[in-house]
Amino acid sequence: MELYRACYRSRIKWDKMRLPLPDEIDKTLLRIRRINRKAGVTGALLLVDQHIIQVLEGHTGQVLDTVYCVMNDPRLNDIEGIIHEPADFRLFPNSLMFFRDLTDGRAAAQHEVLRPLLDHP
């Protein structure tokens, strides 16, 4: 089967968070990793300023199913697809969901790949 990669950016709806942010992240990552293990999906989740950026990779159906779940998450809005394409290899082959908190904004603002993702209104 062909590998597929999707990347999206979305704005966080802080009023929909039920737990303090660190607890919300831990709970969400546990759920994501459990689901990804069953689905064969890998990827990364970056928390940047008021947004998250997520990369998902795996077989097309499983990746698109995951994107559909994200689109229905009440904690997110303004979801914007960045990459949707076949992939020759996985960028995160050993990570059910890599996570990095870049909320200070400085690291992301200086990163040549991340900055354009944040410059959208």
Predicted regions and their residues:
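Charge-rich, low-complexity N-terminal segments
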Residues: 1-121
